[in-house]
């Protein structure tokens, strides 16, 4: 192409000569860059380009595309500066070479230019800077052109190839030259823009030998996998689909070329060899029980007959050929831009669990089987089941299989009457009261409990399964249906006549199991099918019981995991793995971790600063003889009691006195007297939102509108807690602190201390601070005079059975520097189950404004912690949410802070264990790894910047380290620096006297998002449904609350 010249990369930093020109104007190549004897002078264009004087272009002449006369407007570069046009498409981005190494620190990771204005030959001129939104009549859409550069290599070496993108797809240089000038034309970076690991890993801390539940997998890069699509009609259940696949393989060995294909139970079949034909149709017949199921179907008036055999048509079609070479390149080649072959990885995952699927229930990536232990009753019609999780992961050591113990709640397989007796408290006496009917509210609760559950009838043998869609409005006794002759029949009479069965629970409704036509089944004749995951919200008691099932000490968990891999808990066969040339190691991965030292903490003591180092094994510290770092002043507060006995009420005066005394000892000024005498109400008040709000308003009025704190003492946990928090924080404007009477009966020093610390944090105080500020800890990055803001973000979604409620997002940000231990939040509701934060730019803008008011200047750096993102969403989250933060920052002229974007993951299955030395077990083998343990080798990503950090001491079960993945890093952290930063932050969580497992910005965001969820859920008496397309906004916080850590 005319005007194209090669640039030159200087070989020596200290003697950098001038580089070649970029792409010039009007077809002429840009001139060479000016030389520099010492590498300090800026790169300057020496050619005739009209744009050479712009600093961005001086730094990077390759940013300029090839201009063609005809377009007007301006180019907006990096969201900050503009260039005058003509600069029309087609755009060609020249990626080779990057600038000399001395300039690398001066440039952003990605330079981007968006061109605005009037496209060539457009009929009318668009307004200046209008994104080319003008559309000529009956012509293709106008231009919206973006140019972006690849992230610069850290070594400063030139990229090895030119890459051209046109019309949002990779293309050739020749095709670029012939792009229609009215088509959208984009020059974009490669997908792999995730930050690379900056070094070989950290070195700080004492070494500790560990093992991880990752098992190395050897695979043959030359092994092809043939992916077939499977279409079965009529659509079978998952269990039936597996039976069909098994019989299909048994009956057609020659057609399938003798292979034993792996099946995911839905649509995908994977074979190590190609079938005889790429498209083939089979007919598979399965035996079905002769008995007729007892289901009354309206308009037929007879039982649904079942045939001896049911025939399924199976269409198998070749979709693609997958090869292991791409995965081998991804694992072993140190290059950016190599995509992870997800299809091949998924195929291998299916292959490795195929053997276990024959005797297990698959839920997500976990398999549950009786061989892992009997189901345990956890109450409420649910049982807890043990299983195992397995997933292939690309790691530094190669492909590894992550195997872990898994727990989940399932519906108990029992009769519907018995199930409802356990599930619904108001039906506990149902077997003794067979004539009992359901009130309107009870009918809704029972329907909610049974909806979508699979059942089978029990008075006769049948393998037919049904989904419960709803309940009949009429009771069984009054329910009629019309037979084929048009005669109305009573359901009760029908079952007596045809099955000699007297319906016992006549005043209960029938189950409606037909979607299109009404099909009725009496409740007492139905049984809940086994193996159904419990999707409803677990109660606190159920959650506690299922967590206890998973509280194995490290040695026990390690033994279970080893047993799974060796096949002790399922009939695992290596047949499938052998066919696909896979070999899974039976040994856990051995590696070395490092234990980081705890930071020195700052407390108060009689008005002086006191430092302590948490040197206990669990890194806990005490406030004995110490003050909080900064105590709040609470002059106006009140107490209200909900429920409780007269004896418990008598304890309130003692509680108020001891709490105020403990606060005084901690340096917190809590008025020894409440503004009004304690108020005692029945707990039923929490059921009535209107009366509750009126009562709280009266308390606020008694304080002349200046009530700072309301302590709420409850007889027990109550669903009205959500209404209480919502009313207090959004309507009344007061911070609340709830506690239970059961704790007041003891009034231990630990309880009073914890309560005082929470109150202090909520009312603007500061409990703990680092003795050495962040600029002292990481002087290469942080400066005292350049403030830094730590941000955290999380999105919470409604429980799985809720198909309409909005998701809730929370963003928090630190408001002080250099302590960085006070955070405020912003919350929003957004589209149902959407993970990307929709209004991040608005919330970030509000937080920046608050930071500016508190600190006096905008932060020069932003460290953003994003919780709750899966690996498949990394690129989308980085692209959209980083853009939102950048957009917010660009509203301040000339403001461009350096941003580091880190994803925080707790929901993973990597576990770290003490490793026995010389094959002998040590006294550490049954202990959790110590707080501060960090791992950034062997089991981490082959190239990207991630690590595991266990910052807390696990008191129960086996510790789960937190996985931190740096997606974007403009601050150029080294491994040791970012690990030390996060580790030390974990000691500053406001309501704990020990380090927490999650970095506080992410932890606070999680708490704030949960609070927003409470605002929507409310108590059952005030719940409402919305359409999936409607997003109910969260109620607005009162001004005197939203600047506090009320959610803590």
Curated annotation (Swiss-Prot):
Read off the SUPFAM superfamilies from this record. PAZ domain, Ribonuclease H-like
Region called Disordered, residue ranges: 1-50, 121-141
Pfam families linked: ArgoL1, ArgoN, PAZ, Piwi
Q: Which Gene3D superfamilies match?
A: 3.40.50.2300, paz domain, Ribonuclease H-like superfamily/Ribonuclease H
What GO terms are given for molecular function?
RNA binding; RNA endonuclease activity
Tell me, in a sentence or two, what this protein's role is. Involved in the RNA silencing pathway. May bind to short RNAs such as microRNAs (miRNAs) or short interfering RNAs (siRNAs), and represses the translation of mRNAs which are complementary to them. Regulates shoot apical meristem (SAM) initiation and maintenance and leaf polarization through the trans-acting siRNAS (ta-siRNAs) pathway which probably modulates the expression of the ARF2, ARF3, ARF4, ARF14 and ARF15 genes.
> What is the designated name of this protein?
Protein argonaute 7
**Organism ancestry:** Eukaryota, Viridiplantae, Streptophyta, Embryophyta, Tracheophyta
């Amino acid at each position: 192409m005319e005007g194209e010249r090669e640039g030159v990369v200087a070989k020596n930093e200290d003697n950098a000569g001038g580089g070649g020109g970029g792409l010039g104007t009007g077809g002429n190549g840009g001139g060479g860059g000016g030389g520099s004897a010492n590498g300090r002078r800026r790169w300057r264009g020496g050619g005739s380009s009209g744009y050479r004087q712009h600093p961005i272009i001086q730094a990077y002449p390759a940013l300029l595309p090839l201009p063609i006369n005809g377009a007007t407007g301006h180019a907006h570069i990096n969201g900050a500066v503009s260039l005058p046009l003509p600069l029309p498409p087609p755009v060609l981005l020249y990626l080779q070479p990057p600038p000399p190494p001395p300039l690398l620190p001066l440039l952003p990771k990605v330079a981007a230019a968006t061109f605005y204005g009037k496209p060539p030959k457009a009929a009318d001129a668009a307004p200046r800077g209008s994104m080319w939104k003008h559309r000529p009549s009956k012509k293709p859409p106008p231009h919206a052109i973006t140019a972006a550069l690849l992230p610069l290599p850290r070594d400063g070496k030139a990229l090895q190839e030119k890459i051209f993108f046109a019309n949002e797809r990779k293309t050739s240089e020749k095709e670029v030259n012939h792009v229609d000038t009215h088509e959208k034309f984009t020059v974009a970076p490669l997908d792999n823009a995730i930050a690379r690991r900056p070094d070989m890993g950290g070195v700080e801390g004492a070494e500790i030998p560990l093992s991880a539940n990752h098992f190395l997998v050897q695979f043959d890069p030359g092994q092809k996998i043939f992916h077939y699509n499977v279409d079965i009609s009529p659509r079978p259940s998952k269990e039936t689909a597996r039976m069909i696949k098994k019989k299909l393989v048994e009956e057609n060995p020659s057609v399938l070329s003798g292979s034993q294909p792996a099946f995911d139970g839905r649509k995908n079949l994977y074979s190590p060899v190609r079938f005889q034909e790429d498209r083939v149709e089979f007919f598979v017949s399965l035996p079905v029980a002769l008995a007729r199921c007892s289901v009354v179907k309206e308009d037929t008036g007879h039982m649904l007959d079942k045939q001896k055999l049911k025939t399924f048509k199976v269409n198998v079609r070749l979709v693609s050929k997958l090869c292991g070479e791409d995965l081998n390149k991804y694992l072993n080649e140190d290059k950016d831009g190599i995509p992870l072959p997800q299809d091949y990885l998924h195929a291998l995952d299916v292959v490795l669990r195929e053997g276990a699927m024959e005797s297990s229930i698959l839920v997500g990536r976990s398999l549950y089987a009786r061989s892992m232990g009997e189901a345990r009753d956890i109450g409420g019609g649910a049982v807890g089941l043990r299983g195992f999780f397995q997933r292939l992961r690309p790691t530094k050591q190669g492909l590894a299989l992550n195997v872990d113990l898994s727990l989940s709640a399932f519906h108990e397989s029992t009769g519907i009457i018995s199930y409802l007796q356990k599930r619904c408290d108001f039906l506990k006496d149902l077997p003794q009261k067979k004539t009992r009917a359901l009130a309107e509210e009870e009918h809704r609760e029972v329907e909610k409990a049974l909806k979508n559950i699979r059942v089978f009838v029990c008075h006769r043998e049948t393998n037919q399964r049904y989904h419960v869609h709803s309940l009949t409005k009429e009771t069984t006794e009054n329910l009629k249906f019309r037979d084929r002759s048009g005669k109305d029949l009573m359901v009760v009479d029908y079952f007596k006549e045809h099955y000699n069965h007297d319906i016992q629970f006549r005043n209960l409704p029938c189950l409606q199991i037909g979607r299109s036509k009404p099909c009725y089944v009496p409740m007492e004749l139905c049984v809940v099918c086994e193996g159904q995951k419990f999707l409803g919200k677990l109660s606190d008691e159920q959650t506690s019981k299922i967590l206890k099932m998973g509280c194995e000490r490290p040695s026990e968990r390690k033994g279970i995991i080893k047993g799974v891999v060796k096949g002790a808990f399922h009939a695992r066969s290596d047949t499938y793995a052998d066919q696909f040339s896979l070999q899974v190691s039976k040994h856990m991965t051995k590696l070395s971790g490092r234990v980081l030292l705890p930071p020195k903490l700052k407390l108060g003591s009689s008005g002086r600063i006191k430092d302590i180092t948490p040197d206990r094994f669990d890194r806990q510290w005490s406030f004995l003889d110490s003050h909080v770092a900064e105590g709040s002043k609470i002059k106006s507060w009140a107490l209200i009691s909900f429920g409780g006995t007269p004896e418990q009420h008598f304890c309130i005066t003692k509680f108020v006195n001891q709490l105020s005394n403990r606060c005084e000892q901690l340096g917190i000024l809590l008025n020894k007297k409440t503004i009004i005498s304690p108020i005692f109400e029945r707990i039923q008040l929490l059921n009535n939102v209107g009366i509750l709000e009126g009562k709280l308003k009266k308390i606020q009025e008694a304080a002349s509108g200046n009530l700072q704190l309301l302590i709420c003492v409850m007889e027990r946990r109550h669903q009205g807690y959500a209404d209480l928090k919502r009313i207090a924080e959004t309507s009344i404007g007061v911070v609340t602190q709830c506690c239970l009477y059961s704790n007041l009966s003891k009034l231990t020093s630990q309880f009073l201390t914890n309560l005082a610390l929470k109150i202090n944090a909520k009312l603007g105080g500061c409990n703990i601070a680092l003795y050495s500020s962040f600029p002292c800890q990481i002087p290469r990055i942080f400066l005292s005079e350049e403030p830094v803001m730590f941000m955290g973000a999380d999105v919470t979604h409604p429980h799985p059975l809720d198909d309409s409620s909005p998701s809730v997002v929370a963003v928090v940000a630190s408001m002080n520097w250099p302590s960085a231990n006070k955070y405020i939040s912003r919350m929003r509701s957004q589209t149902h189950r959407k993970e990307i934060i929709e209004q991040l730019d608005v919330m970030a803008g509000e937080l920046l404004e608050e930071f500016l008011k508190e600190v006096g200047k905008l932060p020069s750096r932003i460290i953003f912690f994003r919780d709750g993102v899966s690996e498949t969403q990394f690129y989308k989250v980085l692209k959209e949410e980083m853009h939102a933060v950048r957009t917010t920052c660009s509203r301040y002229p000339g403001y461009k802070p350096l941003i580091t974007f880190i994803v925080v993951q707790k929901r993973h299955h990597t576990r770290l264990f003490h490793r026995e030395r010389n094959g002998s077990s040590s006294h550490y083998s049954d202990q959790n790894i110590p707080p501060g343990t960090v791992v950034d080798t062997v089991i981490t990503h082959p190239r990207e910047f991630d690590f595991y950090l266990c910052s807390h001491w696990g008191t129960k079960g086996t510790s789960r380290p937190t996985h931190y993945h740096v997606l974007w890093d403009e601050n150029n952290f080294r491994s040791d620096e970012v690990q030390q930063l996060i580790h030390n932050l974990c000691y500053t969580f406001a309501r704990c006297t020990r380090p927490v497992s999650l970095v506080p910005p992410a932890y606070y965001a999680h708490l704030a998002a949960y609070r927003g969820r409470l605002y929507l859920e409310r108590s059952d008496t005030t719940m409402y449904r919305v359409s999936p397309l409607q997003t109910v906004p969260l109620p607005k916080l009162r001004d005197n609350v939203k600047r506090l850590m009320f959610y803590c």
